């Protein structure tokens, strides 16, 4: 009888733990929306840092990770493209959730003439 109780408790604990999602980054976020480009390279971002090709801006008041946060941006291209950029600016972006440099936008697999692409980012 004691073995059955212990086994039942073990199964209950195991199934309860299985219901939780453990992550190495408790603050991980996933944001869906359009990715656009802007020519901020060489200008001073909201972080005070001079912006480079792999810096980006997030939408002000929508999602504001800390300055310097590593962001993985995914375009819904075929094949799927992924770039790594760093949040060092913010912007109003009426039709997007992430602004990247022209070089980073091209790395997603699109010409600048496209303007915006569907995708998401995570950090």
From Swiss-Prot:
It comes from the Bacteria. InterPro entries: RlpA-like_DPBB. Induction: Positively regulated by the two-component system YycFG. Expression is maximal during exponential growth. This is Uncharacterized protein YdjM. It comes from Bacillus subtilis (strain 168). The gene is ydjM.
């Amino acid at each position: 009888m004691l073995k059955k109780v212990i086994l039942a408790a073990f199964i209950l604990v195991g199934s309860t733990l299985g219901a939780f999602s453990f992550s190495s980054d408790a603050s991980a976020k996933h944001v869906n929306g359009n990715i656009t480009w802007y020519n901020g390279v060489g200008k001073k971002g909201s972080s005070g840092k001079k912006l480079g090709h792999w810096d980006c801006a997030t939408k002000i008041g929508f999602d504001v990770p800390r300055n310097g946060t590593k962001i993985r941006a995914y375009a819904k291209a075929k094949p799927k493209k992924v770039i790594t950029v760093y949040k060092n600016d913010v912007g109003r972006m009426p039709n997007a959730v992430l602004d990247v440099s022209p070089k980073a936008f091209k790395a997603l697999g699109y010409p600048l003439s496209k303007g915006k692409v569907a995708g998401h980012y995570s950090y």
